Regions:
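Basic helix-extension-helix modules of the SAP/HeH family
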Residues: 1-49
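Secretory targeting signatures
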Residues: 1-2, 38, 43-104
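Noncatalytic luminal/extracellular "stalk/propeptide" segments of secretory-pathway proteins
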Residues: 120-251, 258
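Extracellular/luminal Protease-associated
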Residues: 140-141, 200-314, 318, 387, ...
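Soluble metallo-hydrolase cores and metallopeptidase-like ectodomains found primarily
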Residues: 216-240, 307-389, 404, 408-414
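Metal-dependent peptidase/peptidase-like ectodomains
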Residues: 329, 371, 425-543, 548-550
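Short helix-loop-beta-strand segments that form the rim/entrance of peptidase-like active sites
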Residues: 406-433
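His/Asp/Glu-rich mid-to-C-terminal helical/loop segments that flank catalytic regions of hydrolases
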Residues: 547-586
Length: 586
């Protein structure tokens, strides 16, 4: 074979090739290919004429002996043929060589998964949200109550409940914000508020919190009133540095387009140039898909460390940051950006962003015979302004139902070989704070004993298959885990076809080193379990669904919850967790 042929082979196939020719099978893929290429270049021994002396006479003698009868009608040749056949069959059935396609025989037993129970969990979790804004934001009483709920559920299942708490940087929305525009009547002398303003013809436009605008991650506070006439600078799509430099002391207005300037970049530019605030407008994401023709405002986080660095070592506390819908942005542009006499602005954002708040990590544990551990997790916090039914209530409910099923298996089967652990994380939406703090605290134990971390973040598929698709992707950073997942998925397709056949189940192996194109991206709670184990690369699997157009908006509600879709990843990954719990060779 050529090197190109070997490059197209899987590592498992390369190892089978090496094993079949008696060469070592250890090492990276590049080393395996190099070993095979070196072997293919070895000279082949060819017989020369001297080796053929008296060959014809020897063949005649051998053939004569092979025809000699030894048992009834059987001659020596027939006996040898029978013995060789028996030997080959024995090799196949007993030894099962890898070069014939045989591998380790794993006992995959699909776990049960009650999708109706996941909906019960989801409804109970959503009910714990903020009374007005509906979210379970990290560092709030809503998140604390969510953690207690999860601990209670795990305890009832028979797990040893353990609660961890961490003080981390976190912003907090203290009260309902206000964002209004005023075009003064009476030749500009009429007040904006009160009966005199109404008589004088002043027109006040009120933007609705959560629907027309949302506060962004780590936003600072503001109390800009109508009479301050705070100026606005049009920053286009936010990519021109000169415009940012010209916007000192003003509200910067950014139209989000294909350039997709991140929140961290915008907020950092604002801090470096002393802006009075930022207003970004969604002009591109999910437009006309979830609310008429509008582009709904989306909550996004900001990288804390990058922002602090841009601001000279502290968090900027006096730069409010909001995101608007396209329709609301059009109104703002008409009344402020493009108006001959710009409307006055009231922007009251009551937040605290320079303090630490307590976030929680509830866990349930069933001890195994060995020190090795398998952990499954999901983040229980949501954005502040929405239920988060998909992100990530769907993941938490999957984890709880898996935990319930695994507890029942342990009750019937006995102590597992590996420790089984289920955890949920606070602080994910603002920077993976909970999972990172937990990994840092458990650093030594996890580095030495973590077999696998299983992550569930938006492992949900919207029920509108026709318009939103029906795919979900199971992905991992380890080839062995990838093989297990595919084999279990094949079994799932055979035994649970009534659900499996509805979904496009995809697979992805992302085993590149950090920074490479095929790396596991660091955008969910599996990140610290892979990259923050003191130099060791951890192993993780995760699942991502599809069709979540309402992501990070006030419309991510139970109206779109499709509990059936959780059955796929919950059963496949739960089955793998079961295998790892009881088979130390897996």
């Amino acid at each position: 074979m050529s090197q190109l042929d070997y490059n197209n082979m899987l590592v498992a196939e390369l190892k089978q090739e090496l094993e079949s020719i008696g060469l070592p099978t250890s090492g990276k893929k590049s080393e395996l290919i190099e070993r095979l290429m070196a072997h293919s270049k070895e000279p082949v021994m060819i017989s020369i004429e001297a080796d053929l002396i008296d060959e014809e006479s020897r063949y005649d003698m051998i053939i004569s002996r092979m025809k000699t009868q030894v048992i009834g009608p059987l001659n020596i040749g027939a006996v040898i043929a029978i013995l060789l056949s028996v030997l080959m069959i024995s090799t196949v059935l007993i030894i099962q060589p890898s070069w014939l396609g045989f591998g380790d025989d794993y006992d995959y037993q699909l776990i049960d998964f009650d999708q109706s129970q996941t909906k019960i969990y989801a409804e109970e979790l959503v009910a714990l949200g903020h009374p007005d804004w509906e979210g379970r934001m990290s560092g709030t009483v809503e998140e604390a109550n969510t953690s207690l709920y999860i601990l209670d559920q795990l305890s009832e299942m028979g797990y040893e409940a353990q609660s961890y708490s961490y003080e981390v940087p976190m912003h907090h929305v203290n009260s309902e914000p206000s964002f209004r525009l005023c075009v003064q009547g009476g030749l500009g002398f009429s007040p904006c508020d009160g009966p005199i303003g109404q008589v004088g013809g002043s027109q006040v436009t009120i933007f609705q919190h959560r629907v027309d605008y949302v506060i962004q991650g780590l936003s600072g506070q503001s109390e800009y009133m109508f009479d301050e006439d705070i100026p606005v600078t049009d920053l286009g799509n936010g990519t021109e540095e000169a415009l940012w430099q010209s916007a000192t002391g003003t509200l910067g207005y950014v139209r989000m387009d294909e350039s997709r300037v991140s929140n961290t970049e915008m907020y950092s530019y604002a801090a470096q140039n002393d802006l009075a605030g930022i207003i970004s407008v969604n002009k591109i994401i999910n437009c006309g898909q979830i609310e008429g023709n509008d582009c709904v405002p989306i909550f996004k986080g900001t990288n804390y460390d990058a922002l602090v660095s841009a601001n000279g070592g502290t968090i900027p506390t006096e730069i409010p940051f909001i995101a608007m819908s396209r329709d609301a942005g059009d109104i703002f542009e008409a009344l402020v950006i493009n108006a001959t006499e710009p409307a006055s602005i009231e922007l009251i954002i009551d937040v605290t962003n320079d303090e630490e708040r307590t976030i929680y990590v509830p866990c349930g544990i069933i001890e195994g015979r060995s020190s090795e551990v398998i952990i499954a997790g999901a983040h229980h916090d949501t954005v502040y302004q929405g239920e988060g039914a998909v992100d990530d209530t769907s993941g938490v409910t999957t984890v709880l139902e898996m935990a319930r099923q695994l507890a029942e298996i342990v009750n019937n089967t006995g102590m597992p070989e590996r420790t089984i652990q289920f955890c949920t994380w606070g602080g994910e939406e603002e920077g993976l704070w909970g999972s990172r703090a937990y990994v840092a605290e458990m650093q030594s134990s996890l580095r030495n004993n973590l077999r696998l971390y299983l992550n569930f973040d938006m492992n949900h598929v919207d029920a509108d298959f026709q318009n939103r698709g029906n795919s979900l992707t199971l992905f991992t950073n380890n080839e062995d885990d990838y093989g297990h997942i595919k084999r279990i998925a094949n079994l799932y397709t055979e035994e649970r076809d009534e659900i499996a056949n509805k979904y496009d189940i995809r697979f992805s192996l992302l085993d590149g080193a950090k920074g490479e194109s095929n790396e596991m991206p660091c955008n969910s709670d599996y990140c610290p379990f892979i990259y923050e184990l003191d130099g060791k690369v951890g192993r993780a699997v995760s699942c991502y669904g599809s069709g979540a157009w309402e992501y990070h908006t006030y419309l991510d509600t139970m109206d779109r919850f499709n509990e059936e879709s959780l059955h796929v990843s919950g059963t496949i990954y739960g089955t793998y967790m079961r295998l790892l719990a009881y088979d130390m060779n897996a």
